[in-house]
């Protein structure tokens, strides 16, 4: 049995920098994550970045990463730091 059959979920955390606050970025991240069936959260950080944490199948996390790089229309993503993260259970994807 493959590892993916035993443990289908992983967790990732992204720190997104650029013009990502006040432009609907967290709403965009939430819509994308819900569309992909992921759980977690998106929140603004004091330093101007947005933190996105998501749990789900690796293929869906990769899809979300691509969407986060594009961002919503008014955003200007200048860089993303991606990290593997410990899995924390959430029942939905929320904006904090």
From Swiss-Prot:
PROSITE patterns associated with the record: ACYLPHOSPHATASE_2 (PS00151), ACYLPHOSPHATASE_3 (PS51160)
Residue ranges of every copy of the Acylphosphatase-like domain listed in the record: 11-96
Enzyme Commission code(s) on record: 3.6.1.7
InterPro entries on file: Acylphosphatase, Acylphosphatase-like_dom, Acylphosphatase-like_dom_sf, Acylphosphatase_CS
Keywords recorded for this protein, A-Z: Hydrolase
Active site residues according to the UniProt entry: 26, 44
SUPFAM superfamilies in alphabetical order: Acylphosphatase/BLUF domain-like
Top-level lineage group: Bacteria
Reaction catalysis annotation: an acyl phosphate + H2O = a carboxylate + phosphate + H(+)
Molecular functions per Gene Ontology: acylphosphatase activity
Transmembrane annotation, as ranges: none
Record-stated family: Belongs to the acylphosphatase family.
Name of the protein: Acylphosphatase
Record organism: Solibacter usitatus (strain Ellin6076)
